Amino acid sequence: MKVTFDPAKRQTALSEKGLDFVDASIVFDGPTITVQDTRRDYGEARFQTVGFLADRMVMVVWTPRNEARHVISMRKCNDREKAIYQERFSQG
């Protein structure tokens, strides 16, 4: 799976959150839950994928661009999200 991103946003995520957009492909290759973000009109389809990076549950926000997933943001899930998604992962 090809992953693209804005280099400046990648650097911000690395500096502020310790997460590298390059690693989003690891998240996408594992078990995930993906939902479309329809809270507003972003001008393009936008998705939120929850998955795992090492032992951390993370959320990757992305949009399809050509044959790639273009990463917009990536962050660790908060406690509320962990509880919700852990239950969903447990259900299979």
Residues covered by each model-derived region:
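Ribonuclease/tRNase effector modules and their secretory precursors
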Residues: 1-92
